[in-house]
Amino acid sequence: MGIEENLRLMQTLDNAWNAKDWETFMKRHSENVAVYWPGQPDPTRGRHAHHKESVEFFKAFDNHLDNNPYKILFGYGDYTCSVARWTGKNIGSFMGPDGRIIPATNKKFELEFCTVAQWKNNEIVEEKLFYDLVGLLKQLGVTLTTKTQAEKVPAV
């Protein structure tokens, strides 16, 4: 498959995301896709797991990618890279990067969202998602907590 076809498929994937067209969304990801999200220690593995987490994501965030046109869109070999304006509102609870459940803030956000995808046979086999997680949390009014443990200092 060529670069132009991969770019076209990327556009249809983001169109599907915006429309919650889960059938097309699933077709764009391979059965064993690995998806890397900001703040997530391990990738999501598998088409069905990524579909499930995406449906849950929409329960927490009413969101939209401005992908017509993208801010940046290009391909190289089997890869595509897109940067889009990403807007939305936090409408439901979600798990923060510190592991706690954060209740809905009902606040809006606007960020840039970048996807780097590797394609094989018209499907994404690896997808890396990039956005400013700290900026998102700040716009939502969320403060992260840290779990600290008293340091044991040896007696002198």
Please give the residue ranges for each predicted region.
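C-terminal and inter-domain tail/linker signature
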Residues: 1-156
